[in-house]
Structures are given as C-alpha cells and as structure tokens.
Amino acid sequence: MAELKITAANFENEVLHSDKPVLLDFYADWCGPCKMLSPVLHELAEEKNGALKVGKINVDEQMELAMRFQVSSIPMLVVFKDGKAVAKSVGYRPKSEIAAMVEGAR
C-alpha cells in the first residue's frame, strides 16, 4: 500500500470523510524514530489489506496541521474513525502496540 500524503488541502476529504479508520503519522524527514517507524506502519497497512488508511503528515511542510493537533513531539500517531480522533500515541511504538491502538478504535 502506498503512503498517503496528507496536506491541509486534502485532510478533510482523506481523513474526516474517510469510510475506514485512518492512522496518521506526524513525522519529519530528519527524525530518527520517525524513520524507524515508517516500515512498521507500511507493514501494518499491508496486513490490514485495505481496511485501514495510513496517512503521513510532514510537520515541517504542514505546520498548520501540526499546530491544529498540538504536535510537540514526533513521531505522533493519531487514529481517526468517523471523522474524529479516537486514539493518540507519541514516540516510537512496536507494531503490536500500534495494531492494538487501531483495533481499540474500531
């Protein structure tokens, strides 16, 4: 599954109006833990076989979204369901914890 680049322009359509849960990854290219997390999220998306959208928000490019969600530390993961943020995690987490967070949001 390709990564979905989320911007201020497509946030409402891709996240708030999504018919499936969305896992957002707030990251930066220079962030070591963010780089470690990226393949984990890709793997999780593959395992969910289209039942989960995974979107990436570059906080350096999308400062408006970073401020809107009060991102003070990265990586930060937020799960959206039915247009609402239902779970949040800050820092690197193993795939099992992220999967549990997503499942808990269903």
PLM features: residue spans?
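Conserved Rossmann-like nucleotide-binding pocket used by diverse enzymes
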Residues: A2, T7, Y27, K53-G55
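A short beta-strand-turn-helix
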Residues: E3-V22
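Residue-level signature of catalytic and energy-coupling elements of molecular machines
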Residues: F11, L24, L41, N58, ...
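Short pre-active-site segment immediately N-terminal to redox-active cysteine/selenocysteine motifs
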Residues: D19, Y27-W30, S73
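Conserved redox-active cysteine motifs that mediate thiol-disulfide chemistry
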Residues: F26-V40
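Non-catalytic, surface beta->alpha helical segment in thiol-disulfide oxidoreductase systems
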Residues: S73-R106
